[in-house]
């Protein structure tokens, strides 16, 4: 049978353990940010027939946990509705959504998850994350700035991807003389602290 002193010691350890776990959860919650969809943008620049064109996505979500003082606990998780692509050209949008490019019926969601961050100084950061597009996952680095003013912040940055690395371009669309392989991605996320 456990003695009274042993019982008290065990209870004390359990309480300390619970408090430590609670403190860890609170610390993580302090770095959580809520994206404001109406003020946030996710855009890209591509090239078709030698001319640049711009586009974006009307629907995407971003779960952001970011603290410049605790990069190890930071994480980005962005989910993109591929069918919401919008280049202000209906014919081009239909082509991008087709089976040879995004194939939105089979792959309705693209996802980017980053959990490795580097402080480059002067409010500039880089991250290495994994982009999944058309069921292909590859590392994609991003460069960004983070400006926090009283619990409201802007997260702005860029990335560069090669569309053919993700199978975006089947058949004639593999021809990079017609549609460039390099795509510049830009994002500007308006964030509000959730705690």
Q: In which residue ranges do the predicted regions lie?
A:
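C-terminal intrinsically disordered extensions
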Residues: 1-2, 156
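Low-complexity, acidic/polar, glycine-enriched regions of mature
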Residues: 29-195
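Bacterial N-terminal signal peptides that target proteins for export
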Residues: 3-18
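N-terminal signal peptide c-region/cleavage motif recognized by signal peptidases
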Residues: 24-26
């Amino acid at each position: 049978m456990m003695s009274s002193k042993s019982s008290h010691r065990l209870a004390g350890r359990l309480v300390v353990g619970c408090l430590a776990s609670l403190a860890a959860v609170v610390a993580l919650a302090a770095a959580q940010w809520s994206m404001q969809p109406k003020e946030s943008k996710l855009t890209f620049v591509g090239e078709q027939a030698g001319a640049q064109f711009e586009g974006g996505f009307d629907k995407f979500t971003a779960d952001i946990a970011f603290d410049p003082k605790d990069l190890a606990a930071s994480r980005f998780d962005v989910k993109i509705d591929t069918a919401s692509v919008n280049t202000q050209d209906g014919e081009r949008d239909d082509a991008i959504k087709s089976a040879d490019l995004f194939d939105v019926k089979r792959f309705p969601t693209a996802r980017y998850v980053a959990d490795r961050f580097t402080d480059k100084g002067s409010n500039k950061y880089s991250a290495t994350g994994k982009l999944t597009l058309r069921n292909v996952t590859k590392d994609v680095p991003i460069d960004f700035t983070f400006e926090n003013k009283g619990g409201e912040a802007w997260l702005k940055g860029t990335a560069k991807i090669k569309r053919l690395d993700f199978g975006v371009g089947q058949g004639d669309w593999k021809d990079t003389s017609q549609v460039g392989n390099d795509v510049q991605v830009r994002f500007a996320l308006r964030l509000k602290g959730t705690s």
